[in-house]
Amino acid sequence: MNKTIMALAIMMASFAANASVLPETPVPFKSGTGAIDNDTVYIGLGSAGTAWYKLDTQAKDKKWTALAAFPGGPRDQATSAFIDGNLYVFGGIGKNSEGLTQVFNDVHKYNPKTNSWVKLMSLAPMGMAGHVTFVHNGKAYVTGGVNQNIFNGYFEDLNEAGKDSTAIDKINAHYFDKKAEDYFFNKFLLSFDPSTQQWSYAGESPWYGTAGAAVVNKGDKTWLINGEAKPGLRTDAVFELDFTGNNLKWNKLDPVSSPDGVAGGFAGISNDSLIFAGGAGFKGSRENYQNGKNYAHEGLKKSYSTDIHLWHNGKWDKSGELSQGRAYGVSLPWNNSLLIIGGETAGGKAVTDSVLISVKDNKVTVQN
């Protein structure tokens, strides 16, 4: 009898270890956004187009349910956050009424109770793409991202060039062959108050802005990890925003994913351990840039990291690996762990699965 019970226990443990974290997303999902509220996950945009879905993680029969479509058109690199039961979506990259790719600076609100969207009469003072968003004391905070005028101008130039390959090569060379500071990535910190729908200046980085950083916050601290310093060039920097007391303090932690860094990585916290995983970048680009080659990633192949790093005792330790490199998915806090939904793998392939990264006693567990 005891042997039977033991065999059953082993079988159940094996099943749990191999069970999917969440059901596959309804479509391959990358470059979108997502948020979690009361154990219900919401994802949308990116490769899902205007579609949004939700999933109750506590339901016995877990499944994705389609929601009302986003009214602002398909978008990549939007961000989202829940505040007081409503979902707010900030900016992104999409097509304007003339069919040109552009950065948006608008805000949409979704009401889960009525399954309805509304575009707010509120525009951020700068474009929002490649930015990060986090919530602190009932307000949304936005920082980082590309410069709206420079980014939009690049795509206007490409549109003018049409199919003229010579003109396109010239435009690309002109766009990428500049120093990082010449792209004016956003280093300002903006706050959005949903009660007034107003934007305010909340501070600025003493260093530089990034695009495609990973963000995670807990209590009065928020961490911005890696990201682009300019198009094609990542940074290995880690910034900490400390809201303790009345004055916001910016701190710089030891770098991670050195020397080249990554963008589109995933960040979370498990049992008070800060986690950074995945991301994509160009190996050798940092050396090229330091040697005076501004078009630092020219001719280099994008690589996808499998590394999982933990911040421990004041330094980063590589503590595990993903089953495959991935980037540009959604990372959310769930079950005291880091939940990764979707993303892209080598070649830019969008995926439908989820990954759960947990930490206990500085040991990493990865569940696919």
Swiss-Prot record:
InterPro entries: Kelch-typ_b-propeller, NANM, NanM_proteobact. This is N-acetylneuraminate epimerase. One of its GO terms (molecular function) is racemase and epimerase activity, acting on carbohydrates and derivatives. The keyword Glycosyltransferase does not apply. It is found in: Periplasm. The keyword Repeat applies. Keywords: Carbohydrate metabolism, Isomerase, Kelch repeat, Periplasm, Repeat, Signal. It catalyses: N-acetyl-alpha-neuraminate = N-acetyl-beta-neuraminate. Homodimer. It comes from the Bacteria. Kelch repeats lie at residues 40-84, 86-137, 139-173, 174-219, 222-265, 287-336, 338-367. Residues 1-19 form the signal peptide.
